[in-house]
Structure formats: structure tokens, C-alpha cells
């Protein structure tokens, strides 16, 4: 099911994006190309393909977690633009 320009406009409105007519056309074409490709992928027979999480046999290699002393409070607060009662003071977020 192809995406219409009206649907792209609706999504842009929800995302608070202002798109030019050229951008609307381009995004409509790009999204439709993606959906066509998805249809091709959905048509593939994958019954005999083993599910994998990663195509390469790799594992994450992590370093050991070592606790180390942190910065003293005074040193950490030195570069702060504003400090109150030994803590960073930041503008209120409403």
C-alpha cells in the first residue's frame, strides 16, 4: 500500500516539521521505495534459514569493571557556572 503525499504531510505536521513541496514529493517517493523493498523482502522464502542475531560469529569483548575513586566534589564543581549547597544548579525544566 503506497504512501500518499497527504500522509507525509500529516506525519510532518505531527513531527512539527515544515516541508517544502519538493521535500514532500521526495519523502513520498523515498518512503514508497522503502515499502516496495520491504514487500520484496517479505516475499522471500526464509523457512530454511536459521534465525541469527548477528551474521558474524562475534561476541562482545568487555574489559573487567574496576571501581576507581571519582573526582572530589569540590573539583567537579569547579567548572560549574552555578553551584548551590554543594550541587550543580541548573535552570528549571518545565
From Swiss-Prot:
Disulfide links within the chain: none
Single GO MF annotation: asparaginyl-tRNA synthase (glutamine-hydrolyzing) activity
Presence of the UniProt keyword Protein biosynthesis in the record: yes
Pfam families, per the entry: GatC
Region (Disordered) location: 72-94
SUPFAM superfamilies in alphabetical order: Glu-tRNAGln amidotransferase C subunit
Catalytic activity: L-glutamyl-tRNA(Gln) + L-glutamine + ATP + H2O = L-glutaminyl-tRNA(Gln) + L-glutamate + ADP + phosphate + H(+); L-aspartyl-tRNA(Asn) + L-glutamine + ATP + H2O = L-asparaginyl-tRNA(Asn) + L-glutamate + ADP + phosphate + 2 H(+)
One GO term of the biological process aspect: glutaminyl-tRNAGln biosynthesis via transamidation
InterPro entries found in the cross-reference section: Asp/Glu-ADT_sf_sub_c, GatC
Enzyme category, top tier: ligase
Protein keywords: ATP-binding, Ligase, Nucleotide-binding, Protein biosynthesis
Entry EC number(s): 6.3.5.-
Keyword Glycosyltransferase in record: no
Biological role stated in the UniProt entry: Allows the formation of correctly charged Asn-tRNA(Asn) or Gln-tRNA(Gln) through the transamidation of misacylated Asp-tRNA(Asn) or Glu-tRNA(Gln) in organisms which lack either or both of asparaginyl-tRNA or glutaminyl-tRNA synthetases. The reaction takes place in the presence of glutamine and ATP through an activated phospho-Asp-tRNA(Asn) or phospho-Glu-tRNA(Gln).
NCBIfam families per UniProt: gatC
Similarity section: Belongs to the GatC family.
Subunit structure: Heterotrimer of A, B and C subunits.
Stated name of the protein: Aspartyl/glutamyl-tRNA(Asn/Gln) amidotransferase subunit C
Protein source organism: Moorella thermoacetica (strain ATCC 39073 / JCM 9320)
Gene assigned in the entry: gatC
Amino acid at each position: 500500500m503506497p504512501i500518499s503525499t497527504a500522509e507525509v504531510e500529516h506525519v510532518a505536521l505531527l513531527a512539527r516539521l515544515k516541508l517544502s513541496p519538493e521535500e514532500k514529493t521526495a519523502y513520498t517517493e523515498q518512503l514508497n521505495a522503502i515499502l516496495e523493498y520491504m514487500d520484496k523482502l517479505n516475499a522471500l522464502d526464509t523457512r530454511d534459514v536459521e534465525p541469527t542475531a548477528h551474521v558474524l560469529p562475534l561476541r562482545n569483548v568487555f574489559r573487567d569493571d574496576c571501581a576507581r575513586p571519582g573526582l572530589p566534589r569540590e573539583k567537579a564543581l569547579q567548572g560549574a557556572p552555578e553551584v548551590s549547597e554543594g550541587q550543580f544548579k541548573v535552570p528549571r525544566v518545565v
